[in-house]
Amino acid sequence: MKTKEMSEAIGVNPTTIQRWTKYFKIDCDVTEQGHFLYTEKHLQLFKKIKRELDEGKRMKDINLNERQGQGEPSVPTKQYEAKLEKMLVQVDALEEKLATKADDVVSYQLLKHRSELDEMMKLVGTLEDRLLFIEKRMMSHHHQEKQVVNEHTPKKIKRGPWRSFMNLFAF
């Protein structure tokens, strides 16, 4: 049924039918030329809209959701449930892959940190060995220096006790 036929059946202008279609977002078929095609369900819907407007309701106060929901669902329930189940299985598989990937990343990071710690421990060991070697060299060098200093220091000349006593009162 075209817009003009629908308007004649209800008793309103064709532009009113078009305005109601857009305002209430009524689903209907559209021809290649852009003309709306309505069914018998649409006729009943438009009659209810006209009746409520005639009763004094404003267009924004008219609720069509309950009336439009009376038809059959667009997808059969069994088909919907099967599709939903398939999607849930896919979501579970993705979650499992994500968990596995996260475990792999953590394992890799732990191995990387462990190898870095091993390298640092080797470096610390090498530095410790070098430090001990340097300390030994310094100690042996220090002992040699002491011996050389002891050999080259002149022995003190002994002076009498009066000389020390006199040095105390020297100005």
UniProtKB/Swiss-Prot annotation:
Broad class of the protein's primary localization: cytoplasm
Disulfide-bond pairs as recorded: none
Keywords: Cell cycle, Cell division, Chromosome partition, Coiled coil, Cytoplasm, DNA-binding, Sporulation
Any single biological process term in GO: chromosome condensation
Coiled coil: 77-105
InterPro entries: Chrosome_anchoring_RacA (IPR023522), DNA-bd_dom_put_sf (IPR009061), MerR-type_HTH_dom (IPR000551)
Subcellular location: Cytoplasm
Top-rank taxon: Bacteria
Keyword Cell cycle: yes
Pfam families per the UniProt record, alphabetical: MerR_1 (PF13411)
Signal peptide: none
DNA-binding region: 3-23
GO cellular component terms attached to this protein's record: cytoplasm
GO MF terms, alphabetically ordered: double-stranded DNA binding
Described purpose of this protein according to its UniProt entry: Required for the formation of axial filaments and for anchoring the origin regions at the cell poles in sporulating cells, thus ensuring proper chromosome segregation in the prespore. Binds in a dispersed manner throughout the chromosome but preferentially to sites clustered in the origin portion of the chromosome, causing condensation of the chromosome and its remodeling into an elongated, anchored structure.
Similarity section: Belongs to the RacA family.
Stored NCBIfam families: PRK13182.1-2
HAMAP family: RacA (MF_01170)
Descriptive protein name: Chromosome-anchoring protein RacA
